[in-house]
Structure formats: C-alpha cells, structure tokens
C-alpha cells in the first residue's frame, strides 16, 4: 500500500522538530509540499515521488487539462522562498509561543501551551462564542479563524512580526474588555 503525505506545512514541522524535511518524508512514497504556506512564496506547490510516480502524475495532469505556462516564474518564487525564508520560520514559532503565553493570561481565554509547537496557536474563548469573538476582532482589524463553538486559530507567518503580535494582543484585550462591560 503506497502512502502519500500532505506536506503543506512540512517546512514548519521540520523546524519545530529540529530535523530535516527528508527525515519526515522518508516513510512516504510521495508527498506534496507548498511554497506559499509558511515560506511566503506568492504561489506554488510541488509533488515529490519516484520517477515512475511523477511520470504518471504528469500524464494525469495532462489528461485533466492541468498545466502551467511560464512555470519558471513560479519556480523562481519558490526557490527564493526556500533560500531566504526557511531560516526565519523559527521566528514564527517564537512569536506564536509569545502570543499563546499572553493569551493564557487573559480572562475569558484558554490555551494549552504544550500544544503550541510551531506557528499555529489554537485556543478557546470562554467569554463568548468563537464566531462573536472573531467577528469583534475582525471589526478591529485582526483576522483569525473560528473552529467550533469556542475554538479560535491564529497563525504567525512571514507578514506577522513582533509589533503585529503586540497589536493583536491589544485588540483581543479590547474585545474581551468590551464583552465584560
């Protein structure tokens, strides 16, 4: 039985675990990687596998009308992201941990700090529904995703620096204060 890995976030996983991407991918027959999630390329994914597998994938892509003109431009963006942005992924992890630590201290929010291992922070809103919380944050310029009735997901990335995290925390504190008023 062949195994495929959705490796969209493999770059962050490798940095978080302190191991090469190849070590993560080794048990799989194929994997897909994404150059825009985490690395910050404007667009682009790649399929990795044996020569036979890739030849078959190319044939299917062609049969279904898939294809990319000027693929070199996309490849250049992906290569730039690999060469210039991979090393800074640890910054995203650090900011995620800092964000989570601050969230953990806020009344009306709950986060398991042990689960914050990369650039994604999942936490719970106990002061209101996740949708109401996310909507109130969005109205103030902060974009996060609700997940279930109380869950919220925040993601740190290339375009989120320390000042942005501070601003996000201020908005969250403001939303919680308004909910208590």
Residue ranges and their predicted role:
Residues 1-125, 131-140, 144-160, 164, ...:
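Conserved PLP-enzyme active-site core in the AAT-like
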